[in-house]
């Protein structure tokens, strides 16, 4: 099937002053735009419990942003920045952060022209001892490189990044990361290291707000999707259908699948990363239905979900997945996805409501919003621009209700 998406239809003027460069003093003090059946209202994020349907299940992405930027130097003194994207060997995230002595990662290299051979290093002191971290390029893939790290300190790679690395805030903030970003560019429920960008819809939640919502009967579950740098890649082709989606790794627990099935029809995804994770489950379930296995080692393709029969419902998908995990004795399922959710007749199977920030013009995230609300996305963004809403990662939020 030939697909075409004119990306110019998803453009709008976003003045730089409307991009939130820093977070508000209080997470839940942000504004909340409410879209309900074509009607727009304005609330505070702290009041989201008054907006969502009673008893709704909210699904968080509990990934944690790593300090992925490491500034190193050549022996000549040249400054080289190594941006760790995802583990290469060991490739498993948990093992990659627990390893000691050495590992390899897929990275972006800043000032590459000054690093043609040899190693770069950073010297540091730990526990009164002089230590060093060194890095070599072992594979050149153009934009990305496989980099070998070796270090002397008795530390895991996760501890090393925490000690030496810097938080990779979005490039459109046009500033260096600061101390405030170490805490505020993380959700309060972040647990598992692996992301190089935050699932920003969740930045508005506080422990107090979550506690209040639980007391009112709202339920919460978590999935893990490690957000890659590809989330910031603009759609450069005038036909967005030719845009190659980035791959992101995700994980879901059997208990979460069971809860999703129990609450099907009342599921609110907090953020586009939660949307992509939940919707990708339908592809794994269809593989089980048709081939007896989710084939989790094979990436969920960019258009795979569009080829699944419309009558295969989200409830059926969750039943298939739950049954398979129970039969196989799997407590959790790991997979990867390149799913691209667009207005090309995409059928949302798992997600019923979405909490999300305001996204960049001509972005795949804006296509996802359009897939959910149709042409109403422009009314939403016109309202937000006209009523003082702050945009992008540190900006305000919206809740999109299908009612």
PLM regions with names:
Residues 1-403:
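Surface-exposed, charge/polar-rich loops and edge strands
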């Amino acid at each position: 099937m030939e697909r075409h998406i004119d990306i110019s239809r998803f453009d709008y003027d976003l003045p730089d002053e409307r991009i939130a460069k820093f977070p508000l003093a209080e997470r839940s003090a942000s504004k909340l735009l409410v879209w309900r059946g074509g009607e727009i209202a304005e609330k505070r994020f702290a009041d989201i419990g008054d907006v969502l349907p009673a008893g709704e299940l909210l699904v968080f992405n509990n990934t944690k942003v790593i300090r992925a930027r490491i500034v190193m130097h050549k022996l000549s003194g040249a400054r080289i920045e190594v941006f760790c994207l995802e583990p290469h060997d060991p490739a498993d995230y948990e093992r990659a952060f627990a390893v000691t002595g050495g590992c390899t990662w897929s990275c972006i290299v800043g000032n590459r022209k000054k690093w043609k051979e040899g190693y770069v290093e950073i010297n540091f002191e730990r526990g009164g001892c002089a230590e060093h971290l060194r890095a070599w390029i072992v594979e050149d893939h153009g934009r990305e490189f496989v980099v070998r790290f070796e270090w002397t300190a008795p530390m895991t790679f996760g501890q090393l990044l925490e000690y030496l690395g810097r938080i990779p805030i979005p490039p459109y903030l046009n500033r260096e990361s600061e101390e405030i970003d170490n805490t505020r560019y993380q959700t309060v429920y972040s647990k598992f290291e692996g992301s190089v960008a935050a699932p920003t819809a969740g930045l508005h939640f506080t422990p107090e707000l979550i506690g209040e919502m639980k007391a009112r009967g709202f339920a919460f579950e978590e999935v893990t999707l490690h957000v890659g740098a590809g989330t910031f890649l603009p759609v450069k082709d005038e036909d967005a259908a030719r845009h190659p989606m980035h791959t992101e790794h995700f994980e879901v627990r059997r208990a979460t699948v069971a809860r999703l099935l129990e609450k099907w029809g009342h599921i609110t995804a907090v953020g586009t990363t939660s949307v992509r994770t939940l919707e990708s489950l339908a592809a794994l379930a269809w593989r089980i239905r048709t081939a007896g296995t989710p084939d989790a080692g094979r990436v969920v393709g960019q258009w795979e979900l569009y080829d699944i029969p419309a009558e295969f419902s989200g409830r059926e998908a969750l039943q298939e997945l739950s049954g398979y995990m129970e039969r196989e004795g799997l407590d959790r399922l790991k997979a990867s996805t390149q799913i691209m959710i667009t207005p090309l007749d995409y059928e949302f199977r798992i997600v019923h409501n979405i909490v999300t920030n305001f996204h960049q013009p001509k972005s795949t995230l804006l296509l996802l919003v359009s897939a959910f609300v149709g042409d109403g996305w422009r009314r939403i963004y016109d309202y937000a621009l006209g009523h003082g809403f702050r945009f992008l990662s540190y900006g305000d939020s919206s809740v999109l209700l299908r009612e």
